[in-house]
Amino acid sequence: METPESEKTRFEVECEFVQALANPNYLNFLAQRGYFKEEYFVNYLKYLLYWKNPQYARCLKFPQCLHMLEALQSQQFRDAMAYGPSAKFVEDQVVLQWQFYLRKRHRLCMLPEGEDQDVEESEEETVENEQKESEDEEDVVIVEKPEDEQEEQAEEAAEPTDTSLLNT
């Protein structure tokens, strides 16, 4: 029978370990050291699936660790994580998740109901505009100014501006 203090310590250690699984480089480290080939370690990963229960999952700061924990149940994924390029690919996907999906989700959660459709339409328009701009950029020719003109522009930019206009 565990004491309350040892239960708390075990909870904290397991929580930290599960969250460490969100780091693809750490998974690569474990795979290269042969941990994923050890039966006791694979059984430990199965045991840790209890973190998917909402009462435990709410304690996690990095919810993507649960996805990694689920993926680690697959022998194929564990084998793939031993290779650097595979770990790099997973890391890139995690970064893309942070950059785009979570930002979009946050925006959608902040909108009142009924505006979701407007956001989707405006995003489609944005994609179309970006495609048009990229097509237009292909036709642009960059002409460099002579060094004398560049120096003059740099001097003009360095001159102090009239701040009295800013106070109005």
UniProtKB/Swiss-Prot annotation:
A Pfam family that the UniProt record links to this protein: Med31
Domain of life: Eukaryota
TM helices/strands, residue ranges: none
Places the protein is found: Nucleus
A single MF term (Gene Ontology): transcription coregulator activity
GO biological process: regulation of transcription by RNA polymerase II
Region spans: Disordered: 113-168
Keywords carried by this UniProt record: Activator, Nucleus, Transcription, Transcription regulation
Protein name as it appears in the record: Mediator of RNA polymerase II transcription subunit 31
UniProt KW Transcription regulation keyword: yes
Function description: Component of the Mediator complex, a coactivator involved in the regulated transcription of nearly all RNA polymerase II-dependent genes. Mediator functions as a bridge to convey information from gene-specific regulatory proteins to the basal RNA polymerase II transcription machinery. Mediator is recruited to promoters by direct interactions with regulatory proteins and serves as a scaffold for the assembly of a functional preinitiation complex with RNA polymerase II and the general transcription factors.
One annotated Gene Ontology cellular component of this protein: core mediator complex
InterPro entries in the cross-refs: Med31_sf, Mediator_Med31
Stated family: Belongs to the Mediator complex subunit 31 family.
Assembly and binders: Component of the Mediator complex.
Compositionally biased residues, Acidic residues: 113-159
